[in-house]
Amino acid sequence: AGLHLGSFALMEDHPRFRDVKLGIIVSSLRALQLFLRKSARTGRLPDYVVVEGPLAGGHLGFGLDDWMKHDLRTITTEVLGWLRQEKLDIPVVPAGGIFTGTDAVSYLETGSAAVQVATRFTVAKECGLPAKVQQEYFKAGEDDIEVNGISPTGYPMRMLKGSPAIGAGIRPNCEAYGYLLDSNGHC
């Protein structure tokens, strides 16, 4: 979770850094611009950019008080427009709030390379979630979803109100260490 601005610099000495496909997840044009500026010295652009809107599951790149003021369509349009203006050929993949095939097609028709759909597949047999958890997703309606601040990263999280993660205790913010926790939950 979070925009790790130094991630490409951390990896650039790895022998496969130039060969593997690397993508980033952003929630705004500003976040993309910051990342590209910070990673410019590595001489490598991301191979794709996932643009997550406020309806994405899990961590959100917005403030707890203003996440609902943003929308995926606007953010995606801004990112696509800026990339065209800068003549940067980086595929854009919108995510968060894409519910139907019609939604997906509308993003593809406006220049997105693909779309990311995740929550819809949590109820699929192949997902690997326990059947009890899948049933909770299947039964959930809009009123069963909340955005809260329980994440150790400090970012708001969108999740089911009945999630076992709620009330499980806050883990330390490990941002300075790359969000790595040991088996005891310590940075």
Where are these regions (language model features)?
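Conserved active-site-proximal phosphate/metal-binding subdomains
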Residues: P46, A56-L72, T76, L80-P91, ...
